[in-house]
Amino acid sequence: MKNLYYVEITDTFGGEANYSWLTRHVVRAKSERGAVNAMSRRSGMNWRFDGMKYLSKSGATCMFIDMYEEEYHGDYSFCSDDRKESEK
């Protein structure tokens, strides 16, 4: 069964998340790694895990992934959304 994952992609400054711009996504995948693969296909970027966040190969952007929870993430607008129409 596939789960929903909440994904934030933002820029970095000095190796830390900067949040001067932000894109939010909801991804349906079997695992967190599957969500990373889906975002790699969509963005055309490769991601590496540093223990806290996923960094792009260039290091200029980072990605955070968490389980999607309607209570916390339901009010955001998303750049891409894999929820079914009945779940929105």
Segments (PLM) and residue ranges:
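Generic structural motif
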Residues: 10-12, 30-32, 57, 70
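Short intrinsically disordered coil segments
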Residues: 22-25, 40-44
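Short, mixed-charge low-complexity intrinsically disordered segments
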Residues: 42-88
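Short amphipathic, charge-patterned alpha-helical segments
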Residues: 35-39
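A short, exposed loop/beta-hairpin motif centered on an aromatic-Gly-Thr core
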Residues: 19-32
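Short aromatic-glycine-(Arg/Gly/Cys) micro-motifs in beta-strand/loop hairpins
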Residues: 1-22
